[in-house]
């Protein structure tokens, strides 16, 4: 056989997701958003506050607490622009959900180790004026809906790309799809869009200290409406 050792290397979920990536055009995504918005109001009485805080242009990190698998969909519905999502690479292999998140613009990220490719790609997207969703908890919240400790990656990326953060509080989502259940339940859900958080590096701070301070502020803002 003449195959090189590189071609024989096993492919990860992230590799497969990258090679099969196909994002729907914005007009199609907006139609899907309208349909999903109607379904979300019907089944979960999803409501929104603070929509005036949404920037429809310019680079922005959209950061939220993470209560259920449906969070990224609910978060995106008020937008009329392209959004990218950092999603667990393994989720691209799930039936139905894997295809949907790929069509809607999700990018794979390996959560068990530093994924420099995903981080570099996201940072460039932001610098080009794009919007990207990041869940600072790194996973779903506690069963009672309370926050996990926030990782500093979102704030660090915002500092590097010189972009603001749009904090979002999702309230009630943990009752829709509790951990251990295979299907969602009916429950009221509310999303609060807070004013933009403009990250800064203060005099005398290094990048790590600034990112941690901004992360703590982000967590405090999101927790204020839980």
Q: Where do the model's predicted regions map?
A:
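Residue-level "edge-of-site" marker
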Residues: 52, 114, 171
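Hydrophobic alpha-helical segments typical of transmembrane helices
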Residues: 27, 31, 35, 71-74, ...
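A generic structural signal for alpha->beta connector loops
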Residues: 43-45, 82, 103, 129, ...
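A transmembrane-helix-recognition feature enriched in membrane-embedded lipid enzymes
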Residues: 3-56, 95-104
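Generic beta-structure capping elements
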Residues: 51, 65, 88, 137, ...
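Catalytic core of membrane glycerolipid acyltransferases/transacylases, capturing the structured
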Residues: 41, 54-113, 121
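Non-catalytic C-terminal accessory region of glycerolipid acyltransferases
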Residues: 1-28, 117-226
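Conserved beta-strand scaffold positions in the cores of enzyme catalytic domains, especially
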Residues: 48, 85, 106-108, 165-167, ...
């Amino acid at each position: 056989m003449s195959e090189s050792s590189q071609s024989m290397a096993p492919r990860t979920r992230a590799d497969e997701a990258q090679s099969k990536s196909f994002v729907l055009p914005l007009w199609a995504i907006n139609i899907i958003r309208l349909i999903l918005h109607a379904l979300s109001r019907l089944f979960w009485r999803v409501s929104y506050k603070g929509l005036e805080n949404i920037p429809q242009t310019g680079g922005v990190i959209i950061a939220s607490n993470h209560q259920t698998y449906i969070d990224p969909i609910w978060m995106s519905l008020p937008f009329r622009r392209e959004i990218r999502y950092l999603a667990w690479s393994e989720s691209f292999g799930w039936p139905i959900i894997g295809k949907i998140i790929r069509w809607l613009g999700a990018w794979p990220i390996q959560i068990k180790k530093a994924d420099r490719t995903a981080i570099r790609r996201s940072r460039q997207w932001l610098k080009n004026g794009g919007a990207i969703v990041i869940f600072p908890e790194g996973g779903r919240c506690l069963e009672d809906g309370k926050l996990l400790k926030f990782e500093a990656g979102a704030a660090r990326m915002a500092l590097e790309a010189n972009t603001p953060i749009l904090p979002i509080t999702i309230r009630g989502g943990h009752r829709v799809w509790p951990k251990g259940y295979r299907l969602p339940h009916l429950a009221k859900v509310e999303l609060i869009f807070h004013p933009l958080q403009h990250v800064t590096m203060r005099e005398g701070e290094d990048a790590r200290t600034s990112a941690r301070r901004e992360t703590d502020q982000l967590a405090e803002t999101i927790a204020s409406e839980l």
